[in-house]
C-alpha cells in the first residue's frame, strides 16, 4: 500500500528496481516478457484511467472506528476471529500499480497511537480470541523505528498475540533495507512466532540481492510465505507460476494465497477472469508436473474478506454486470461482534444458514494491444532505467 492525497496514485520506483529494469532491457529487449514482468507492476499506465461507474476507489471496509481509553483507534482493522491488523504507515519503497490501498489516504501513526492499538488488542473484550496480528501498510519495514514500537507495545500490553505477521515487498524492491538494525527488531521477541509475507509475483524478481535479503530474514528466525495477485501479462501463465513456486520453495518461502486481482479503479487491465485463475491453480495442483507441497490456495478478496475458491463456492452468475455470487462461512453476527464498526456492504446476501454470500466483479481475459498498453508512457532509458516522469524512490 502507498496511499494518495490527491486521488493520483503517483509512480514510485526505487533506484534498485530502475537498475534491474535497465538490465532487463539490455539483456532481453524493451517490451520483452522479462521487462514487462517488472514494468507492468511499477510503471504507471494510461489504462489505469479506464474506469467504469461500478468500480470503486476502495475495495472493502474493515477499519475499527471506535474510541478506546478515550482515544480514537487508528490504523486498526479486523475481519476475522483470531487476527487483527495494524498499519503503522502507508509509506512504501515503490508503488505497485495493482495496490489494494493505492487510493487510501496517506498516514503514519504516532507512537502513542501504536501503543493504544496494542492495549486494545490485549484488553478489549471483543479481542479475547485474538492471537495473531498482521502488521502491514504500506510497508512496515520502511520504518524499523515504528516496527520496534509495535513489537515493544505488543510485548507489554498484548500477551495474547503469539504470532506476528509482517507484510512487505522490501526484499524485492529495496533489499539493502534488510540490515542489522531491522533484524535486531525482528529478533527482539524470541517468544513470539514471526512470519513475513514477501509478495513476489514473477521468477525474474529473484535477483541475487533479493535472495540474500531473504536468507538474512530466515537467519533471523522468521518464517517466510508468499501471497500475491494473479496479474495479466505478468504471471497468468502456467510455466511462469510453476517456476515462481519452485524458486520460492528453493529459497524457503511457503506458498500461501494466489489472489485473483481485485476489482478496483485502474485495475481492469491487470485482471484475468476468475475462471482462468481457477484453471491455472487447478493445473498447478493436479497436473502431476508440479509438487503439491508448493502449491497456493486460489482466493478472491471480496467485500467481506478472503474466499478460497473451492468447488461450490460460486453459486450464481449475473452476466448483466459480469459478477458472480460467492458462498462464504462468515456469519454476520460474528463479524459485527469482532468489529463493532463494520457495516454490511450492499453486495451481501444472507443465506438460510446465517452466512454471508457476496457478489464479486469478474475480470476478462482479452489481451490489450502493445500500442494501447504503453501509449503515452515514457519508457526507461538505458542510462537511468526509469521513465522520465517517475518519482524518485
State where each predicted segment sits.
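Auxiliary Fe-S-binding modules of radical SAM enzymes
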Residues: 1-34, 249-393
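Flexible, acidic/Gly-rich N-terminal and inter-domain linker regions that tether
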Residues: 1-78
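Short secondary-structure boundary/capping elements
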Residues: 68, 80, 112-116, 178, ...
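N-terminal pre-triad scaffold of radical SAM enzymes
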Residues: 70-101
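Phosphate-binding glycine-rich loops and their immediate beta-loop-alpha structural context
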Residues: 99, 113, 139, 154
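Iron-sulfur (Fe-S) cluster-binding segments and ferredoxin-like electron-carrier domains
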Residues: 99-111
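Conserved AdoMet/S-adenosylmethionine-binding subsite of the radical SAM
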Residues: 117-128, 141-290
Amino acid at each position: 500500500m502507498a496511499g494518495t492525497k490527491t486521488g493520483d496514485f503517483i509512480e514510485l520506483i526505487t533506484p534498485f528496481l530502475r537498475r534491474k529494469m535497465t538490465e532487463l532491457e539490455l539483456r532481453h529487449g524493451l517490451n520483452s516478457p522479462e521487462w514487462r514482468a517488472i514494468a507492468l507492476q511499477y510503471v504507471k499506465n494510461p489504462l489505469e484511467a479506464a474506469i467504469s461507474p461500478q468500480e470503486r476507489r476502495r475495495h472493502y471496509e474493515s477499519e475499527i472506528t471506535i474510541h478506546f481509553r478515550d482515544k480514537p483507534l487508528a490504523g486498526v482493522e479486523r475481519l476475522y476471529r483470531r487476527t487483527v491488523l495494524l498499519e503503522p504507515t502507508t509509506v512504501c519503497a515503490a508503488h505497485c500499480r495493482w495496490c489494494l490501498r493505492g487510493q487510501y489516504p496517506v498516514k503514519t501513526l504516532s507512537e502513542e497511537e501504536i501503543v493504544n492499538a496494542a492495549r486494545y488488542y490485549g484488553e478489549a473484550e471483543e479481542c479475547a480470541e485474538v492471537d495473531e496480528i498482521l502488521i502491514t501498510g504500506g510497508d512496515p519495514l520502511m520504518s524499523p523505528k515504528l516496527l520496534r514500537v509495535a513489537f515493544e507495545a505488543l510485548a507489554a500490553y498484548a500477551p495474547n498475540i503469539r504470532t506476528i505477521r509482517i507484510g512487505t515487498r522490501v526484499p524485492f524492491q529495496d533489499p539493502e533495507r534488510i540490515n542489522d538494525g531491522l533484524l535486531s527488531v525482528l529478533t527482539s521477541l524470541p517468544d513470539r512466532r514471526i512470519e513475513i509475507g514477501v509478495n513476489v509475483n514473477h521468477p525474474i524478481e529473484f535477483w541475487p540481492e533479493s535472495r540474500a535479503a531473504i536468507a538474512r530474514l530466515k537467519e533471523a528466525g522468521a518464517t517466510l510465505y508468499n501471497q500475491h495477485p494473479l496479474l495479466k501479462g505478468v504471471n497468468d501463465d502456467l510455466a511462469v507460476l510453476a517456476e515462481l513456486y519452485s524458486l520460492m520453495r528453493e529459497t524457503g518461502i511457503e506458498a500461501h494465497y494466489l489472489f485473483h486481482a481485485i476489482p478496483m479503479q485502474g485495475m481492469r487491465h491487470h485482471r484475468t477472469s476468475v475462471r482462468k485463475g481457477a484453471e491455472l491453480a487447478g493445473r498447478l495442483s493436479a497436473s502431476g508436473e508440479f509438487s503439491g507441497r508448493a502449491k497456493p490456495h486460489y482466493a478472491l478478496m471480496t467485500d467481506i474478506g478472503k474466499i478460497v475458491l473451492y468447488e461450490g463456492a460460486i453459486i450464481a452468475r449475473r452476466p448483466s454486470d459480469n459478477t458472480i455470487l460467492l458462498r462464504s462461512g462468515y456469519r454476520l453476527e460474528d463479524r459485527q461482534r469482532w468489529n463493532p464498526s463494520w457495516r454490511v456492504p450492499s453486495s451481501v446476501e444472507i443465506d438460510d444458514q446465517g452466512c454471508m454470500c457476496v457478489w464479486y466483479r469478474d475480470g476478462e481475459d482479452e489481451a490489450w494491444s502493445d500500442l494501447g498498453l504503453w501509449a503515452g508512457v515514457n519508457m526507461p532509458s538505458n542510462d537511468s532505467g526509469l521513465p522520465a516522469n517517475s518519482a524518485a524512490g
